[in-house]
């Protein structure tokens, strides 16, 4: 795993899960995904979550991001208990505090790269001018300054994912949650996008929580956690 130190100077966790449980029901069949799961992600920290297919990695990410509701336990984001918030307040906190990157870029096809990256800024109530400036700066940071007015269909796969990274950072979030963000890319492009995320983490002190099946990428992060039998355990360097 990465030898750089976890940022002790930055106080408090940006995300905290306490005794988290999640159970799905289909008729009389109950499927328990988590039971009593605990997790803390400190500000500026990078964390990989690994585990077998079907272990619940994506479900955990959705719970941490307030996109799904736990059956038991609590999730705190930026110190706020998610279950105590209304749907509207939870959405506003999510838009302000968290960024999301998925295996598929989820860019809106009818809008340009610039317009896609602007959207979280506009949704937070800022002006179009502020949104344009922020989006252009981020797209230049991900080396897409020459593609501002290109629509997703006019971008390569790697360019689309870099635009998705820029969009995730549009509101300067405390934490970015990534669900296999390089999973659909070839090895070279995946490495480029991953290095970009780490550079932005270092520059902006944005926490990263990445679900990945790639142990090589996981080793580059501060901590690697394995989701196994409904709980999390931290892996040593030798185990990754």
Curated annotation (Swiss-Prot):
Predominant cellular place of this UniProt entry's protein: membrane
UniProt key word ATP-binding: yes
Localization (cell): Cell inner membrane
One annotated GO biological process: lipoprotein localization to outer membrane
CDD domains for the chain: ABC_MJ0796_LolCDE_FtsE
Transmembrane segments: none
Assembly: The complex is composed of two ATP-binding proteins (LolD) and two transmembrane proteins (LolC and LolE).
Entry protein name: Lipoprotein-releasing system ATP-binding protein LolD
Species name: Xylella fastidiosa (strain 9a5c)
């Amino acid at each position: 795993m990465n030898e750089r130190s976890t940022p002790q100077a930055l106080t408090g966790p940006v995300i905290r899960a306490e005794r988290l449980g999640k159970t799905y029901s289909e008729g009389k069949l109950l499927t328990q995904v988590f039971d009593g799961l605990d997790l803390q992600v400190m500000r500026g920290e990078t964390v990989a979550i690994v585990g077998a297919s079907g272990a619940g990695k994506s479900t955990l990410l959705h719970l941490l991001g307030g996109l799904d509701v736990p059956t038991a336990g609590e999730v705190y984001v930026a110190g706020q208990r998610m279950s105590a918030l209304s749907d509207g307040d939870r959405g506003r906190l999510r838009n302000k505090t968290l960024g999301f990157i998925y295996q598929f870029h989820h860019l809106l096809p009818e809008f340009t790269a610039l317009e896609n990256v602007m959207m979280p800024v506009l949704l937070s109530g800022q002006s179009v001018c502020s949104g344009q400036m922020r989006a252009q700066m981020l797209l230049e940071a991900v080396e897409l300054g020459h593609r501002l007015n290109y629509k997703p269909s006019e971008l390569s796969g790697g360019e689309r994912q870099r635009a998705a990274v820029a969009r995730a950072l549009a509101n300067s979030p405390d934490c970015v949650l990534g669900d296999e963000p390089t999973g659909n890319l070839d090895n070279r492009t995946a490495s480029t996008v991953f290095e970009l995320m780490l550079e932005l983490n270092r520059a902006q002190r944005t926490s990263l929580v990445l679900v990945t099946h790639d142990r090589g990428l996981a080793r580059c992060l501060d901590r690697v956690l394995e989701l196994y039998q409904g709980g999390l355990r931290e892996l040593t360097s030798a185990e990754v």
